[in-house]
Curated annotation (Swiss-Prot):
Signal peptide: none
Gene Ontology, cellular component aspect: cytosol
Localization annotation: Cytoplasm
Organism: Caldicellulosiruptor saccharolyticus (strain ATCC 43494 / DSM 8903 / Tp8T 6331)
Keywords: 4Fe-4S, Cytoplasm, Iron, Iron-sulfur, Metal-binding, S-adenosyl-L-methionine, Transferase, tRNA processing
Keyword Iron-sulfur: yes
E.C. number(s) listed in UniProt: 2.8.4.3
Domain (Radical SAM core): residue spans on this chain: 177-407
Domain MTTase N-terminal: 36-154
Domain TRAM: 410-471
Enzyme class (EC, first level): transferase
Binding site for [4Fe-4S] cluster 1: 45, 81, 115
Gene: miaB
This protein's name: tRNA-2-methylthio-N(6)-dimethylallyladenosine synthase
Cofactor needs: [4Fe-4S] cluster
Length: 471
């Protein structure tokens, strides 16, 4: 018996729409001697990156071919993020100039999906401000993309689909992962925590876990296709299985993934501190494929502010967790998220945050200035912190975080570590890989090492990356 309100759907229901669009695109190819192309612009977290891989997989199945040139594309999709105002502003700024392209190419399909249009008022605003948009749909309608696209093509009208009540888990969506030997795998969707600053539960829905057998099957298929490293995704992976009848906890899922032949590294994001169990810490310690890295968002070091954020732990709780992690996994790298300028944050509260940063010595931190999100509890709170105070505190925090990150990376100098080379560096003529602790290492070596594990001696260190040579 399934949980009430959560529906398990097979993607096969979209087959007829995929077939119809593929037929249209085949006719286009025979008439014009070229394929129709698509271009996806992605904002936000790893969940969005993986959703874009699913969009690409569906488009490939419908006969489209990806292009890196937006101007040449026959279909453009913006996969959006709603966590911060800055991300939304970038989307509005990037859609506007496409009207010129749409006027030039009337058959061009332009769509907006993801977390922004999952908010009905935002979807309606997008349609009003940009009447040339063809498809607008939220996160809960991702699996219906072929159907929505077919409707937009055949009716020539803007299609809006924002499913507000239905929480679904859809299996079998085709996925076009980037080239390489690392892959993202969803294990749980949505969030039940309702942190007072966060829009995610409203745009991603309530927590709903994939069945363990579906996850294991997907990872087995990935391993059979040469994938060596998987990152298990969820807004809060520590909640995995709690909503399933006879579900297994997250640490048990890790044990199952650890047993899959061919998979050599396991990562996961994100972990909520309140749900980080001893069993999970012990699993990280004992399972040889689970990497020595955890992303554990602290958000604030002030117990008073954490209470206002609805985080359900104190400063002392967080520090005890970190101590336990370091006791059991001495080489663990800990990264985090920190918000500066939450409503009511005093200088004393901010000093508590700096104190946590000094005591934990995070390997890196994503630092954010508080961004008011409509519909969240924090947006209505009094004592909003003035912008100039937020920015001054932000600069102090970033300075401390980067000093510690540099110190931690310099401690790697002269050491030999294993990295999995998985692509080209942004620095010229270098390949790039990551250590088990998720540190980026640039290395000068031939392409024969691409997608392989190699031992590297660390020769240089900066705040954000290391440089080494193959030994």
């Amino acid at each position: 018996m399934e949980n009430r309100g959560i529906y398990y759907i097979d993607f096969g229901t979209q087959a007829q729409f995929i077939e119809e669009i593929e037929k249209m695109n085949s006719e286009y190819y025979f008439k014009n001697g070229k394929n129709k192309t698509y271009h996806i612009i992605t904002y936000g977290c790893q969940m969005n990156v993986h959703d874009s891989e699913k969009l690409a997989g569906m488009l490939n199945a419908m006969g489209y071919v990806e292009t890196q040139n937006l101007e040449e594309a026959d279909l453009i999709i913006f996969n959006t993020c709603a966590v911060r105002e800055h991300a939304e502003s970038r989307v509005y700024g990037n859609i506007g100039p496409l009207k010129r392209l749409k006027d030039k190419k009337p058959e061009l399909i332009i769509g907006v999906c993801g977390c922004m249009p999952q908010q009905l008022e935002v979807a309606q605003k997008l349609a009003k401000v940009f009447p040339f948009l063809d498809i607008i749909f939220g996160t809960k309608s991702l699996h219906k993309f072929p159907q929505l696209l077919y409707k937009a093509i055949t009716t020539k009208k803007t299609v809006i689909d924002v499913a507000e009540d239905e929480d679904v888990v859809v299996e079998g969506i085709p996925t076009a992962r980037r080239e390489g030997v690392s892959a993202f795998v969803n294990i749980i969707y949505g969030c039940n925590n309702f942190c007072s600053y966060c829009i995610v539960p409203y745009v991603r829905g309530r927590e709903r876990s994939r069945r363990p057998e579906e996850i294991i099957f997907e990872i087995q298929q990935l391993a059979a296709n040469g994938v060596k490293e998987v990152t298990l995704l969820g807004q809060n992976v520590n909640s995995y299985g709690k909503d399933l009848p006879d579900g297994i906890p997250f640490y048990k899922l890790l044990e199952k993934v650890n047993a899959i032949e061919g998979i050599e590294r396991i990562r996961f994001v994100t972990s909520h501190p309140k749900d980080l169990s001893d069993e999970l810490i012990f699993a990280m310690r004992d399972l040889e494929k689970v990497c020595e890295h955890i992303h554990l968002p602290v958000q604030s070091g002030s117990t008073r502010i954490l209470r206002q954020m609805n985080r359900h732990y104190t400063k002392e709780d967080y520090l005890r967790l970190v101590e336990k992690l370091k006791e059991n996994i001495p080489d663990i790298a800990i990264t985090t998220d920190i918000i500066v300028g939450f409503p009511g944050e005093t200088e004393e509260d901010f000093e508590d945050t700096l104190d946590v940063v000094r005591k934990v010595e995070f390997d890196s931190a994503y630092t954010f200035i508080y961004s008011k999100r409509k519909g969240t509890k924090a947006a209505q709170m009094p004592n909003q912190v003035p912008d100039e105070v937020k920015h001054e505190r932000f600069q102090r925090l970033v300075k401390l975080v980067e000093e510690i990150a540099l110190k931690k990376n310099q401690q790697m100098l002269g050491k030999v570590c294993e990295i999995l080379i998985d692509g080209y560096s942004k620095r010229n003529n270098l390949l790039e890989g990551r250590t088990r602790t998720n540190k980026v290492v640039n290395v000068k070596c031939s392409d024969e090492f691409m997608y392989k594990f190699v031992n590297v001696k660390i020769l240089e260190a900066s705040r954000h990356w290391l440089y080494g040579e193959v030994i």
